[in-house]
Amino acid sequence: MKELIEFMARAIVDYPDEVEVTEENTEDQIVFHLKVAESDMGKVIGKQGRIANAMRTLLKVAAIRKGTKASLEIG
């Protein structure tokens, strides 16, 4: 799932080398933290958060297929 987030983020940013995804396991879910260049933050979030919501939806689908829960924090 980490690779999925990296792939999606690198496809839309201007500085793909600065994309960083970290993973934090909690008791009931996996929390992914996505960091991008300051100038790419708007592209990752999108108008009214549409890109961010789409990325979160795809992540949740992948997590359900693996039998777990996952969330994405962008910042």
Each PLM stretch: what is its role?
Residues 1-43, 54-75:
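RNA-contacting regions in translation and RNA-metabolism proteins
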